[in-house]
Amino acid sequence: MPPVRLRLTRETERAAVERAAATLRGGGIALLPAEGVYGFHALASSEPAVERLRAMKARAPERGFIGLLARAEDLDAYAEAPRLALELASAHWPGPLTLVLAARPDAPNALRASDGTIALRCPGSEFLRAVVAATGGLVLSTSANEPGSPPAVRLDAVAADSYDLGIDGGDLSGIPSTLVRVVSGYLEILRAGAVRIAEPPLDGGAVPP
């Protein structure tokens, strides 16, 4: 059965949020527009959906997915956030900045990498934040492209048999979120992206916004 597709406009946004949240709560995969690229999304509490994501992305169990937060203040519920991370979140969230942090003991396994870290973002997209809030849970996100392929910037670039619901937000920029690791008070830029971050000196100095 082909997936359901909805065009995201000001008039359809509320219905799109409700449909996306219902799809995720039902254990489905939703293809949604983020700030720069399209991504597959699943509810972290749905084991079948998580395993389906892993199979689609050929993702080993020791590699976690990005977790999306509806509110920046939810960060502490899942990660150990040092001062440096809190400064970055305060300056750039909501926005296209993904923070890699030490996981709290009760953080979902689907987020965890083998080194004990998790990746979190409070997205700049109001639509995406509304979807996460409407699910009442933590939403996993991963880019909607095959490993080694360019990111998907159009809904039609993604195979229709890979998702249950697609929300068409038009053509996107193709610029991913900036990926920054902040563990033990030190910062490392893992991937350059939409947010420019200056690496501080190793004395743990503050990061300018």
Each model region followed by its residue ranges:
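Active-site-adjacent structural elements in enzyme catalytic cores
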Residues: M1-P209
